Amino acid sequence: MTKQDKDVRAYQQLSTGSFSDPFSFLGPAIDKDQGILRVWVPGAESVYLLVEQERVELEHESYSGFILKQYAPLNEQYYRLAADFSGSEQILDDPYQFHNIYAEYDELHDPKEMYRHMGAQPMTLTRGDECISGVRFLVLAPHASACSLVGDFNQWDDLSLPMQRLDYGIWGLFLPNISAGEKYGFQLKGPRGERLPFKVDPWSFHASLSPHFLSVTFDHSGYQWQDEAWQTREIEPICKQAISIYEVHLGSWMPTQDESISVYRHLADTLAPYVAEMGYTHIEIMPLAEWVDDTGVGQCPVSFFAPTSRYGSPDEFKHFIDCCHQANIGVILAWVAGHFTPHEQGLVEFDGTTLYHHPDPRIGQDQDCHLYFFDYSREHIRRYLVANALFWLEQFHVDGLRVDGVASMLCLDDSRSHEQWQHNIDGGNRNYDASALLKWLNEEVHKCYPRAITIAEDIRMLQGVSEPTFMGGLGFNFHWQVDWVRSSLHFMAALCTEREESLIDMIEPLTSLIGEHSIYPICHDEIAYGRGSLLNQMAGEGKDKLANYRVYFGYVYGLPTKKMHFMGCEFGQNDEWCPSKAMLWQLCNSEAHQGLDILVSDLNKLYRSQAALHELDCDPSGFQWLANEDRYELILAYSRQSSGDDYVLVICNFSMHYYSESQIGVAYEGVYQLLLNTDAACYHGDQGWVSESVESTYMSGEHFDHSVTVSIPPLSCLYYRLI
């Protein structure tokens, strides 16, 4: 093929958006010691070179191509173009003069570095003596035959900016003189040259939802953090910390009517101080990676590196987290790593192949929920997900990640009939590749961010989830105990006269989980999807329902586990949660709901102030049953203790009976002082009589040598501390 034939073919490919090697054809070059400049400007009638003080017209060559021959070499000079479009002249930059857009291997494959190089990265390149600012675009599409950059900067013309195929299946291009706020995306052609749907950037840091879903360039270097005191504070080992988490859906917590202020900024001024005043230690935010469906709650992300723009900008989200930290509140982000949406602009069939999901639908798809599962057997996917986790921790200073749907990641048969799933190599249901990913994820997070907390949402009680990786576990700090919550709520839903048979629901899960690294999650799932509000899951009517609510919370806050509940539970929201509706804050005007609110606040503060209630949550020595055998009295009592001398009794009466002299065995003799009574008048209780302090007496028993005799009102929980 002659050079002329090659030129003709190149122009033909440029004109159809099929050219994969524009650096070999466009831009400045040298031919026989003479400078040549070839540019591609679709729609232009004439093009001029602007360099230093000169203006030189280029010759039209073919299609939309223009060439300048026998000119001084331009290899080291920065130049611009003046193009005439039907009498209107525009000054353009030629991106094909910037060939130095490559990144090193480690920068493109090390999860700690990838998010600093992939996607749209603001940077400055040198051209001759000039430093030119702009944005470099890199996207992985190894099976694509061509890739074009489109955006505001080229009027979404999918022919004007063909990207260069680089190494490792990556396509790249540098656009000079553009900055943050430019909307963009990619137009790709598949392996057979077929035109693919428009794609957003898998690494985009910002997105626009209206009127179309698009990626947006963003510079993460501009925000000035004010949380140094939080980041450098002294802390206990994670398992010994008091952790009380307030789970929040940002869009429905307390919507603002002021459209001039973003949700993120509104919540920085309202949610952060509220959570601090209530005594919580952390906020857990439901998934925030950008999603498309306004009826969803973030469980089906499209842009994994972009906090949803429906609530504000990335910097405004940083401001929200900054304010939380300044209020001494940690922020945990619910993080989706198991699946992605089938939205055609997202990851699905990104380069015309199953680049991100498994080709076998029994492994790669959920036909019922219309989701795609990541193929964890592929190295580029594991790197992408680990890089994403590190990105949220680094760029947004989040204090932890709660990994969504761990059971569905690990179990090939999760929510599937027999014919819908594929066995692993050993004939079992464990997804070994997902296990490898989660181990690596936790190792990288704990190595790079030792203060960060990782939590597994595990509804199947899988073994080893919170064991260290060196012991064969997955390495999470904590895992959810959803079955424990549901069994205890089953007990609380029964009338007091029918609770004898289900008391085991309160005892057995706790007994089997003592010493586990667990969280008791009264999460959004438990008060939605037809289950009803938490308050309405309690037995009884009126005052009895409220009393059941109070004794339940008293029981939960003493358990040897970290705490979490969903927004609205603190004041007894009586409607099932709906993400499109605000919480019923007007309930707080009633004394009954005020009482619940005060109780939860006091429980948070008690839990944090008493080392016995949190220090040994993950150690079997921190918990002991004191009374759990009389199913007719419906009294459960246990002790909590610290590594020092702190010793607290938690005594719960789940019956309608008042016990004036209930004898409870204790491990230590001495005087026990009342810390909290859920039946107190300040919590809108009946203020049944209880002793402010009790002194132990000697008893000859099988388990204890000492006991205390206490009065316990109906449906109440008492906390006593050894003084």
Residue ranges and their predicted role:
Residues 397-399, 414-582, 587, 608-664, ...:
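Conserved alpha/beta catalytic core and glycan-binding cleft of carbohydrate-active enzymes
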Residues 47, 147, 283-285, 401-403, ...:
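Hydrophobic residues within beta-strands of alpha/beta enzymes
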Residues 204-208, 228-240, 249-430, 694:
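Substrate-binding/active-site clefts of carbohydrate-active enzymes
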Residues 59, 293-298, 342-349, 466-467, ...:
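Short glycine-biased active-site loop of nucleotidyltransferases that positions the nucleotide triphosphate
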Residues 272, 321, 389-393, 442, ...:
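Non-transmembrane alpha-helical segments in soluble domains
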Residues 1-241, 264-279, 543-546, 557-565, ...:
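Carbohydrate-interacting/catalytic domains
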Residues 141-143, 153, 167, 177, ...:
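Short, flexible loop/turn elements at secondary-structure junctions
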